[in-house]
Every structure is written in structure tokens, then in C-alpha cells.
Amino acid sequence: EGGEVVTSGLLDFFLYCAMDSTYRAKHLDGTWLSGFAGSLAREALELYRLPYAQAVKKSKRFDHVERMTDVAKVASNYIDLGNQCGEGWFLTGDMIDLIEKGAKQIVCLQPFGCLPNHVSGKGMVKTLSAAYPDVRIAAIDYDPGSSAVNQANRLKLLLATMFE
């Protein structure tokens, strides 16, 4: 159909979780120790993926890898970093990262009836659509209660409008 699947790496999710621990320690009910552990984990994970990030940056085929602190900074313009339900601010930051790298169509899949992701994902669609009017975002629920035909039709509709 002409589309490409792009998703965050698993390491990005771990980095998000580490940053949440740090935020919780500074602003919510987290302990100093959990905040320190989160900061240490984030730095260690960023250091671990540094060779990968440098190699990808040199590549002509792949987009460069953003540091999670940069993703958080951009996301904080639209959603508070204290939003830690589901994927919280990471989902918004990830969509913005895709948009800034040239994506004009985004499918936000909501798996297994995950209410927190449903709220944070669909809740940000209107805000991001207003900020980026040339981008189309479709939130599609993928769970046993959803119609497979409806899911496929919504995806095909988004793909059909991709080249207009």
C-alpha cells in the first residue's frame, strides 16, 4: 500500500520508565533511591545504545535516534511529564518525533483494551492535529472486542489518503 511501519525500540520504553522513576522521586511520591536508580539506569541505557545511535546517524537509510530527554522535552510542550498512565507522555513524544522526521500519517494502535493508553493516545490526537494540521492520526483499537473489518477499513482509509 506504500506505507512503512515505524515503531519505537524496546529500549526507548525502558528509558521512559527510568525517566518516570526520576520524575516520581522529584515531584510525586517516589523515593530518593528510586529517583537515583532511574537516573543511573537512564544514563547507562543511553551509554549502551550510543554506538548504535552513532551508526544510525551516519546511515542514509535510517532516521537518527533521539535521546529520551529530548523526546520528553518536546512532549512536555503538549502533555505534563507527570502523566504516567499507560505510556503517558512517551506516546505523545513518540508521535511528535515521527512527525518531525517527516511522517504525515500515524496509526496509533491501542492494544488489548488498554484504557490508560486509550486515554493518553486518543486524548492527544486532537491537540497534535491542531499543532500539525497536515498530519493525520488514526487511533485504532486492537482487542478481541473490536471488529476486524472495522480495523482493516480504518487502516485502508488512512493509507488511501496518504498520497493525496
Residue locations for each model-derived region?
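An N-terminal assembly and electron-transfer interface module characteristic of large anaerobic redox
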Residues: 1-164
